[in-house]
Amino acid sequence: YSKEIPGERVQLDVMKVRNGAYQFTAIDDCTRLRTIRVYPNKKAESTIHFLGEILNTFPFPVQRIQTDWGTEFFNYDFQYELHDHFIKFRPIKPRTPHLNGKVERSQQTDKTEFWNLIDLSDKTLDLNVMAMEWQEFYNKKRPHSSLNGKTPMQKLKSVKHLVPIQPDVSEKFWESNEEILPRNYKYLKFIKHRNKK
């Protein structure tokens, strides 16, 4: 199952490449277009900076960000940044990584087709530059069986006519009355429901 519209849902995840190197990955559910960057940590500042990289890379408005329950996604600064860009925050259920399957699978591809070819013990390498080169190859030259042999850029070209304009995305965001979610938001939801009785 895939979304039909580019930017309708973007899956995010973070994986450790080595000590002091974390790969942030964003993959568009529809086109499989990706943004990857390497940061020295997975703190709020890195997550917010990565969101800017996503918005600069993807040539379409991002409507929803889907993540796991990592603390890097559940900080208020990151969620306020999402609000500032009219992006809905959609965390998956706890302990269900398969719901973020596209980003998880793409990170496995990174491990086998990219990181395994690099001497990660060499601290002089600029892993971020190398990851960006890999991203370019992945998006423009690497065919994907899930896209019937197309690259993510070829898929994007075939569905570009479906991409909404930013004012429409912004209007839908405000209609949805999005809230900032604390990490224990399910408990808060339970309390609110109980107090209504």
Which residue ranges define each predicted feature?
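Short catalytic-loop micro-motif centered on adjacent basic/acidic residues
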Residues: R37, Q63-D68
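Short small-residue beta-strand/loop micro-motif enriched in glycine and branched aliphatics
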Residues: L33-R37, P91-I92, N116-L117
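Short, surface-exposed connector motifs at secondary-structure boundaries
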Residues: T31-L33, P59-R64
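C-terminal domain-tail junction helix/linker
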Residues: I87, T109-K197
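Active-site beta-loop-alpha junctions of metal-dependent nucleic acid enzymes
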Residues: I36-F60
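RNase H-like two-metal-ion nuclease catalytic core shared by retroviral integrases
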Residues: T67-W69, N75-L82, F89-E113, L125-N128, ...
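Mobile-element integrase/transposase regions
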Residues: Y1-I27, L33, S46-H49, E175-K192
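Basic, flexible linker segments flanking DNA-binding modules
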Residues: Y1-R9, T96-P97, T151-K160
